[in-house]
Amino acid sequence: MAYLPPHKRHPSSTASAPTPNPPPPSLSSSLRSLSLSSPRGRGRVGGGRHPLPSNKIIHAAGCISRWSPLPPFFPSPEDSDGEEPTLRLEPFPCDPIERKTGAKPLALVASSPGQGSSGSTATAVTAIAERFLPDLLAAAKRAKASYAPKEEELVKLNLVARVGKVLFQTQPGRSPVSLETLRQAAKAGEGGSKSQLHKSFYTNVPNECLDDMEQSVVKRMALEFDSSKEHYHVKVFDKHHSDSTISCKCTVEEDGSLAIHKVEWNKVRHLVEDISCLFKDLDLRLMLCTKRILKTLDPEVENALKSLVSSAVIDPDVKGGLRWPLGKESIGERFSIVGVWHTNYKAFRNETLRLKLRHGDRFDHQTSAGEVSNEVTFKLIGMSRRLEDVDPEETSLKEMLEPVVQMVWDNALNYKIVP
């Protein structure tokens, strides 16, 4: 029988098979010790040979990841005197999170506006800039201080704004998420503390959002067409660097084969600011990362990556768009495929801003889970360059940040995600 990868297998439509007998107690105990919630059984590939990184997102030491609503909470509900909007937590259908947790995440929703809560765009923009800029400067300083210059790596600061939905989840063994826990988290964030909330930023927006952004918003923002590209991103685990994942950005050659265009490590996050925009349909994330591009590769690494990529078969019928022949998903004990993305994007830009409208099809080989999404990302390229200066000036950065936030606020947050 021909081999079928996990993401192409489907349950049989014939009568269900008889229920197997339960395993003996000794075997059952052994299986429980290797459950997905156990460190021994989690994050392994190839029959348990490779301990994989448990988290694909890397936060730098000192990274601040916090959340706040806009308009902000009053110090206490009693202080609002009717001016604070009526808020509630509402279940939000989100398949990727539901598959992992078995429950719908929660979104903060304004049931009705308070007497003075709607505010103006100028008020919102000023509030975001004043809160974000001091921590941005501090985070950029920490990031540059942590650079360890290496001949084989090119490290860049990368400041982006993304649109999506802030979602909250209750963690096992902790109190349920409530308005009071959100109020406490927002208060902690005001003091510069890292939020203890278990939150996600869901970036999948409707097709209509991408279409309208391309047809109308680009013109209103005075952006020019930059490029349109298709890439396959092959994610590779290297046992010698177990805390990171190698990402090979690949293009399709004329003969249909893949060629490696760029090789990178995971991005490292230094500052994450999530904002629930209560009177908009979408929320806002501002984030500072470092990109780590590998300029030269160790011969063993280079040969392994080329072998893994050349073995890939483009198949539009599988999640992620690529599959590998049986036995070709790993190289010895050291290298193995852990994921693949197929992305198509259009980019528009001016001198200081680059807008990327991307459609992504992802497959995680560790969990056999796939996801398709539409994403809107604003790359603040002018500010990213300025932050690389030895001593960037806050006033000039504020003058660059506020117009971008205003454009995003007015043009990119008014697309409702319909379940």
Role assignments for model-derived ranges:
Residues 48-419:
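Phosphate-end processing signature that detects enzymes handling 5′-triphosphorylated RNA
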Residues 1-52:
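Low-complexity, prion-like intrinsically disordered regions of RNA granule-associated mRNA regulation factors
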